[in-house]
């Protein structure tokens, strides 16, 4: 595995991360988190289904595409605890995942466009590409946890609502989209962890990042004139002893 080159695992993880973030965006905006089905026994009327999202609410007849009632201010009056938690959890997860994508992109760009000749003056400013991938993997795992937990809670909260009222509540496909996107974030983190563990040197500690520049760079030292003033301890002073 070419650890000092852009590997297929890092590119695949970056693309998987983009797809997962796009899925989280879609799940956040979809008005299909919960549906309430109202059945009428009048043959002259149609059944009504109320679709509840995180930000809007829509009511439509069965077989219809137009909303009879569209509540655009639903986000400020959400009375269901699981949806209220999702209003904060999903945007937070998206922000964390976007930060992870940025770190992953920085690591890949540094690996692809790094100079083969090390510059000792920029040694302290070099970006550690492998360290970026490691931190990005941790952030992807955190984003997946933040988005997956409240999304699964919606399923159990529907069971609670059906027991408390009537069995007319059901979760909609926005739950599936978000759960699948959270799974994509976990897959992205797993790919980055596998790449890092396969490339790291085994004797080194697990948390020690890889160096993106050639190892020979550590053997370079600045000229004597560029060093700071050496103390008496650092300078080997010959000791002359007088014998009588």
UniProtKB/Swiss-Prot annotation:
The chain crosses the membrane at residues 11-31, 88-108, 136-156, 175-195. It comes from the Eukaryota. Keywords: Cell junction, Cell membrane, Membrane, Phosphoprotein, Tight junction, Transmembrane, Transmembrane helix. Gene3D superfamilies: 1.20.140.150. Residues 32-87, 157-174 are extracellular. It is found in: Cell junction, Tight junction; Cell membrane. InterPro entries: Claudin12 (IPR013287), Claudin_CS (IPR017974). It is a multi-pass membrane protein. The modification Phosphoserine is found at residues 228, 231. Residues 1-10, 109-135, 196-244 are cytoplasmic. Plays a major role in tight junction-specific obliteration of the intercellular space, through calcium-independent cell-adhesion activity. Belongs to the claudin family. Interacts with OCLN. This is Claudin-12.
């Amino acid at each position: 595995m070419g650890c000092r080159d852009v590997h297929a695992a890092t590119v695949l993880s970056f693309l998987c991360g983009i797809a997962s973030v796009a899925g989280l965006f879609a799940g956040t905006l979809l008005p299909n988190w919960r549906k309430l089905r109202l059945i009428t026994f009048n043959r002259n009327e149609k059944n009504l289904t109320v679709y509840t999202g995180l930000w809007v609410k829509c009511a439509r007849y069965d077989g219809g595409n137009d909303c009879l009632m569209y509540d655009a201010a639903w986000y400020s009056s959400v009375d269901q605890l699981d949806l209220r938690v999702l209003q904060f959890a999903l945007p937070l997860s998206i922000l964390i995942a976007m930060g992870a994508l940025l770190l992953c992109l920085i690591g890949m760009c540094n690996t692809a466009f790094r100079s083969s000749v090390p510059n000792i003056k920029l040694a302290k400013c070099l970006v550690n590409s492998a360290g970026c991938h490691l931190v990005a993997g941790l952030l992807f795992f955190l984003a997946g946890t933040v988005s997956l937990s409240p999304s699964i809670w919606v399923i159990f909260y529907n069971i609670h609502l059906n027991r408390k009222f009537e069995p007319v509540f059901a979760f909609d496909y926005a739950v599936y989209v978000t759960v699948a996107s959270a799974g994509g974030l976990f897959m992205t983190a797993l790919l980055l962890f596998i790449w890092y563990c396969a490339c790291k040197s085994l004797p080194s500690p697990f948390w020690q990042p890889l160096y993106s520049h050639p190892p020979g760079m550590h053997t370079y030292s600045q000229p004597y004139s560029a060093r700071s003033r050496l103390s008496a301890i650092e300078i080997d002073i010959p000791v002359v002893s007088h014998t009588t």
